[in-house]
């Protein structure tokens, strides 16, 4: 991957990034830790060069293989919800995609474990995370429905594609006292769900309507 300018210029400059973060705050994102992480992570490095000029628009963008980098507001809100009970020590992300959500998490928590089913996306995400010198992310080519049992339990789990229902394996890998944030539902419209584990009980609440790509089984 050709070396790119993390600082950015013009439509990828720090000033443009700051304007996006200010807009996120105006739209209800309150956690200063999350806003700071979004300010620090160069989103333009996590999209193709042809889309760099749109990187700081508050919109999802295609990343290839029928996948997208999530809308910044959604990344911020899901991260904010994950951190609400306290900073988790270990977070599992299901759906690495571009690597951007993992990069934001890596600014905020000690360890990030991220699974991606599409090998070509995983390779590019690994290169991008190395380029921005975030080394506390461990990536795996695998089926998100199976989770990553070797490093379970996780204090936080964040799912960046939408299953029809919560995968049982992910609930089992959530630590007691941990929190899971995921979009649930069919193609086109889902609800963002927050799940808190209390022993063998799982408390759920719906937060907002969202639209994510579907979560698929297997790996390619």
Swiss-Prot record:
Its main location: cytoplasm. Gene3D superfamilies: Vaccinia Virus protein VP39 (3.40.50.150). GO terms for biological process: methylation; protein modification process; protein repair. It is found in: Cytoplasm. Pfam families: PCMT (PF01135). The active site is at 70. It catalyses: [protein]-L-isoaspartate + S-adenosyl-L-methionine = [protein]-L-isoaspartate alpha-methyl ester + S-adenosyl-L-homocysteine. One of its GO terms (cellular component) is cytoplasm. GO terms for molecular function: protein-L-isoaspartate (D-aspartate) O-methyltransferase activity. Keywords: Cytoplasm, Methyltransferase, S-adenosyl-L-methionine, Transferase. It comes from the Bacteria. Its EC number is 2.1.1.77. The keyword Transmembrane does not apply. InterPro entries: PCMT (IPR000682), SAM-dependent_MTases_sf (IPR029063). It is an enzyme of class 2 (transferase). Catalyzes the methyl esterification of L-isoaspartyl residues in peptides and proteins that result from spontaneous decomposition of normal L-aspartyl and L-asparaginyl residues. It plays a role in the repair and/or degradation of damaged proteins. Belongs to the methyltransferase superfamily. L-isoaspartyl/D-aspartyl protein methyltransferase family. HAMAP family: PIMT. This is Protein-L-isoaspartate O-methyltransferase. It comes from Halorhodospira halophila (strain DSM 244 / SL1) (Ectothiorhodospira halophila (strain DSM 244 / SL1)).
